[in-house]
Regions:
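Compact, glycine-rich, soluble single-domain proteins
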Residues: 1-117
Length: 117
C-alpha cells in the first residue's frame, strides 16, 4: 500500500491481525528507503512497541485516529525498552532519521482494498 506522510511517500506492508503486529519487522535484515510497516488498530488506545528481535534502527511514528502524528520515537536494534504512547490508532515503522515530525498527517492512497482501513 502507498502512503504519504510529511513530504515523503512510502510503500508499506499493513499489519492488521495480532499475529502480523507481533511479528512486525522482526525478520527483516534491511528496509528500503521508501519502505515501512503500518500497524492499524480498531480504536485509539495506549500502544507500546519494543525492538527486542528487530535488527533495523527505526523511527516508530505514533498517530491518532485522524492520522496526525502524535510522536516519533527512535527504536534501537534489539533494545527491550518500551516505547509507548496513548491515543494511538496507527503506528508507522520506517528507517530512522525519516524526518517525520509531530503534526505531520498520514494520507493513504486508494490503489487497492488496503485503503479500507
Amino acid at each position: 500500500m502507498k502512503i504519504e506522510i510529511g513530504d515523503k511517500e512510502y510503500n508499506v506492508e499493513v499489519a492488521r491481525t495480532e499475529e502480523e503486529k507481533v511479528k512486525g519487522l522482526q525478520e527483516k535484515e534491511s528496509l528500503g528507503e521508501d519502505e515501512g510497516m503500518l500497524f492499524v488498530y480498531d480504536e485509539p488506545q495506549e500502544i507500546a512497541f519494543w525492538m527486542k528481535d528487530t535488527a533495523i534502527p527505526l523511527d516508530i511514528v505514533f498517530m491518532d485516529e485522524d492520522g496526525e502524528v502524535i510522536s516519533v520515537k527512535q527504536g534501537q536494534p534489539y533494545d527491550e525498552t518500551l516505547l509507548e504512547e496513548d491515543g494511538v490508532m496507527y503506528v508507522l515503522e520506517v528507517n530512522q532519521n525519516s524526518g517525520i515530525q509531530p503534526g505531520d498527517e498520514l494520507d493513504m492512497e486508494d490503489d487497492d482494498d488496503d485503503s479500507q482501513l
